Amino acid sequence: MNHDNYYIFDAGNWRVATPQEADGFTDLVDVYANLKSSEKVVFIIRHSERTSETGASGHLTDNGKKYARELGARLAKVGTEDFYFGYSGYTRTYETCENIAQGKGQVNYSIVELPYMDGAWYVKDADKAEAYTNSDGGGWVVYSKYGFTGAYPDAFYDLETRSEQLLKDQILANIGSMKRVNVMCTHDYLVVPLLAYTTDGHANVRYYEKNRWVNYMAGVAMIISADGSVRYIPVKGLETGTM
């Protein structure tokens, strides 16, 4: 695959991960704490805990709001700079950004709607994706099988091509209008295939095989160095990156 190295944080230093380690998640706050002044980071994470309402207007639970505020408070202990926030257009992703910002005490923030953070980013044919979801054991099975095995090519875009469009054409191309630290709140159906891509298939979210799924506020940190090179780190905002 044509993307940069996957790194892991170990004993105070970054190093290239071994394939056996590449299913681990690093605390998002640790990644921020170890970010160099010349680097930028984009945290692409799933929203916090939601209610049973899965539509666009579904809210976070009270616990979900609390978890996001607590993450913000932990981030504030590292630094006081303002973050950029983007969301998918869904209420629960907006509320995740809002509560992280409030938890870190950021007064001046706007939360920008980013269409490319929609959970259907990888979906080529929505009707076929829904049909497979109904026939093959649910969305967690279908989306993880797609991300890790390339299944359902009639329903989903090519993983590498679509991931590069997201990372390079949407995020990197617009990084100049963002801040040093950026939080983009999205959905599990985007995060799981993206984790599959950025870890060369090693991330521990292969629900179809291992019954592991990405946890709330977990996802990928995209770190952009001063020379323009990029590295990716699976990150967690809660105690564990999977559920």
Segments predicted by a language model, with ranges:
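Active-site-proximal alpha-helix that buttresses catalytic centers in soluble enzyme cores
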Residues: N2-W121, G139-S163, T199-V230, P234, ...
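Beta-strand elements within well-structured catalytic alpha/beta cores of enzymes
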Residues: K40-R46, G86-Y87, S177-L190
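Intrinsically disordered, low-complexity regulatory regions in eukaryotic proteins
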Residues: G55, G137, Q170-I171, S177
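Catalytic toxin/effector domains delivered as secreted proteins or via bacterial secretion systems
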Residues: S57, L190-V191, A196
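Glycine-rich phosphate-binding loop signature in dinucleotide/nucleotide-binding domains
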Residues: V78-T80, A173-K179
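Short alpha-helix plus adjacent loop in nuclease-associated cores
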Residues: M117-N134
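Extracellular low-complexity, Gly/Ser/Thr-rich intrinsically disordered linkers
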Residues: S163-L166, T186
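A well-ordered secondary-structure block
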Residues: K168-I171, D188
